[in-house]
């Protein structure tokens, strides 16, 4: 079957909006559809081909109003999908949610009267609420407690391994086991000051992306169909981590059948915490922990201090989604049906920036897109978390836990960047059953890994913000490493840094520094 026929068939399948019944359909051996997206860095210049995880369609028009009737949704008619641009993104790694901030902490930006002219998305509350969406999942949707996932059967060659890195604090910790202490790694000196960003925010048009995200809802950014893996809390930890690898996902919502609700997320961070806590323990062997159930893990290590799952409604704005992701230091934001409580979709930094990148070409271009990274000072340049290539893997785990970051630039003795070690590299220790060899140095681990990971994509201080955004979206990565001409590390520009600058800073909100 041709790709176009598969995509058409996908839109006709009932129940795809809820995300419970469908997995992403893609012909064997073929990647995501390419899409022509105008470059932010060269207005009116030639278009470049992108390997996009979002299906944009033939025309680049504004996302239509998010209006669908109950009848249309129940019959699986996806013709009125808000923007018709979306294909399920490759699933990314995410840290577990932190404490929910609650409605009182949601940011409210003042209108300046300089809003860009674009159509508003009708809130679902005024159109068709999602009450008709399927109720919480059935047995076939959830991996039951007796489900087994074999590492030898795990096929991970297709995984998208981009992981967001923010050197300030990239991930919250649901389990609450992280203690702040100095990381045993070198840290470059400050090389770039923050110079012109505050001035740019005072110029007309600086709030165009902020207003755009305020006027569109999470429903607009939801995939037509998506792959969603859900774990029952009675599943054994070992089987759960193997299932993450086997299904090519980095996080899964946790369903508590006793409470009949979602109670959290299981992520690669949890696997790192298990290794970090018990690798050197003289009392407990790691294989004993493998037999624990997820429920037991949560009860023992949360010690009754359960934090609410950070989530968002499809009626909420994309502005609120950006704020929730950055404020709570999480990588995945579940979109929950406000009536049934079912998980409809999971939003990520990468998906939100892709949405903004596609339709941002139809908006007036702010002048700050033409300014250089060095002038604007967007990114992290102080106290960077890095790891020496000669350091053992256990040292990298220490840094992941202590600094709460999701990827580490790997440097040699002279400070040159030679690689990137991410949290997702750690989960493959489970897939290869080599997590008892954490004394191997990071450089050797990078040479032995079987997958072609995201790699080290870099930028230089003289490049403009528009060029940096184009490269991140085109390469589908979560950060660019800022280097000089000799490949010495200067800083890191992450998705959080960019979304903070484009969406939150114009509203006077600093979620990264909060």
UniProtKB/Swiss-Prot annotation:
Which residues does AMP 3 bind?
331, 380, 385, 406-407, 478, 494-497
Domain of life from the UniProt record: Eukaryota
List positions binding ATP 2: 250, 332, 350, 422-425, 449, 457, 478-479
> Where is motif AMPK pseudosubstrate found?
318-339
Ranges for domain CBS: 222-283, 305-363, 380-440, 452-511
Residues recorded as binding AMP 2, renumbered to this chain, are: 250, 350, 422-425, 449, 457, 478-479
Q: Where does AMP 1 bind?
A: 265-270, 310, 331-332
Name any Gene Ontology BP term: positive regulation of gluconeogenesis
UniProt-recorded Gene Ontology molecular function terms: AMP binding; ATP binding; protein kinase binding; protein kinase regulator activity
What post-translational modification does the entry describe? Phosphorylated by ULK1; leading to negatively regulate AMPK activity and suggesting the existence of a regulatory feedback loop between ULK1 and AMPK. Glycosylated; O-GlcNAcylated by OGT, promoting the AMP-activated protein kinase (AMPK) activity.
What does the subunit comment say?
AMPK is a heterotrimer of an alpha catalytic subunit (PRKAA1 or PRKAA2), a beta (PRKAB1 or PRKAB2) and a gamma non-catalytic subunits (PRKAG1, PRKAG2 or PRKAG3). Interacts with FNIP1 and FNIP2.
Q: Which disease is it linked to?
A: Defects in PRKAG3 are the cause of the RN- phenotype which is associated with excess glycogen content (about 70%) in skeletal muscle. This mutation originated in the hampshire breed pigs and has beneficial effects on meat content but detrimental effects on processing yield.
The similarity comment for this entry is: Belongs to the 5'-AMP-activated protein kinase gamma subunit family.
For domains, the record's comment is: The AMPK pseudosubstrate motif resembles the sequence around sites phosphorylated on target proteins of AMPK, except the presence of a non-phosphorylatable residue in place of Ser. In the absence of AMP this pseudosubstrate sequence may bind to the active site groove on the alpha subunit (PRKAA1 or PRKAA2), preventing phosphorylation by the upstream activating kinase STK11/LKB1.
Q: What is this protein called?
A: 5'-AMP-activated protein kinase subunit gamma-3
Organism of origin is Sus scrofa
Q: What is the lineage of its organism?
A: Eukaryota, Metazoa, Chordata, Craniata, Vertebrata
Instruction: Report the gene name.
Output: PRKAG3
């Amino acid at each position: 079957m041709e790709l176009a026929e598969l995509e058409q068939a996908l839109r006709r399948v009932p129940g795809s909006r809820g995300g419970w019944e469908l997995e992403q359909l893609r012909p064997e051996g073929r990647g995501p559809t390419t899409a022509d997206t105008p470059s932010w860095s060269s207005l009116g210049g030639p278009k470049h081909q992108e390997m996009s995880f979002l299906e944009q369609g033939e025309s680049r028009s504004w996302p239509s109003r998010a209006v669908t009737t109950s009848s249309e949704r129940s019959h699986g008619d996806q013709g009125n999908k808000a923007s018709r641009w979306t294909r399920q993104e490759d699933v990314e790694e995410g840290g577990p949610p932190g404490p929910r901030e609650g409605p009182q902490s949601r940011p409210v930006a003042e209108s300046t009267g300089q809003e860009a002219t674009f159509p508003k998305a009708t809130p679902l509350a005024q159109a068709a609420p999602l009450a008709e969406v399927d109720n919480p999942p059935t047995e076939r949707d959830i991996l039951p407690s007796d489900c087994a996932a074999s590492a030898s059967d795990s096929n991970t060659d297709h995984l998208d391994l981009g992981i967001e890195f923010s050197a300030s604090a990239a991930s919250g910790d649901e389990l609450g086991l992280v203690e702040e202490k100095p990381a045993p790694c070198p840290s470059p000196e400050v090389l770039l000051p923050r110079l012109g960003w505050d001035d740019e925010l005072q110029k007309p048009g600086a709030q165009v992306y902020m207003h755009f995200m305020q006027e569109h809802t999470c429903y607009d950014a939801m995939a037509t169909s998506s792959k969603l893996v859900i774990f029952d809390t009675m599943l054994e930890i070992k089987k759960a981590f193997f299932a993450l690898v086997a299904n090519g996902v980095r996080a899964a919502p946790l369903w508590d059948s006793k409470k009949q609700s979602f109670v959290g997320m299981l992520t690669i961070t949890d696997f790192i915490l298990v290794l970090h806590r018990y690798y050197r323990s003289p009392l407990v062997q790691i294989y004993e922990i493998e037999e624990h159930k997820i429920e037991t893990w949560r009860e023992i290590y949360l010690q009754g201090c359960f934090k609410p799952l950070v989530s968002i409604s499809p009626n909420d704005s994309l502005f609120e989604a950006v704020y929730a992701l950055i404020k709570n230091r999480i990588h995945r934001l579940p979109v929950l049906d406000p009536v049934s409580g079912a998980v409809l979709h999971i939003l990520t930094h990468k998906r939100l920036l892709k949405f903004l990148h596609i339709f941002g070409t139809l908006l007036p271009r702010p002048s700050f897109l033409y300014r250089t990274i060095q002038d604007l000072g967007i990114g992290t340049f102080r106290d960077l978390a890095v790891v020496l290539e000669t350091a053992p893997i256990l040292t990298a785990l220490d840094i992941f836990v202590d600094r709460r970051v999701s990827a580490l630039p790997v440097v040699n003795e002279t400070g040159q960047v030679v690689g990137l070690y991410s949290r997702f590299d750690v989960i493959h220790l489970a897939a290869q059953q080599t997590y008892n060899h954490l004394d191997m140095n990071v450089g050797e681990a990078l040479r032995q890994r079987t997958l072609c990971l995201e790699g080290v994509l870099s930028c230089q201080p003289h490049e403009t913000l528009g060029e940096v955004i184009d490269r991140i979206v085109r390469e589908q990565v979560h950060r660019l490493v800022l280097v000089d001409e000799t490949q010495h590390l200067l800083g890191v520009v992450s998705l959080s840094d960019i979304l903070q600058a484009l969406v939150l800073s114009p509203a006077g909100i600093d979620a990264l520094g909060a």
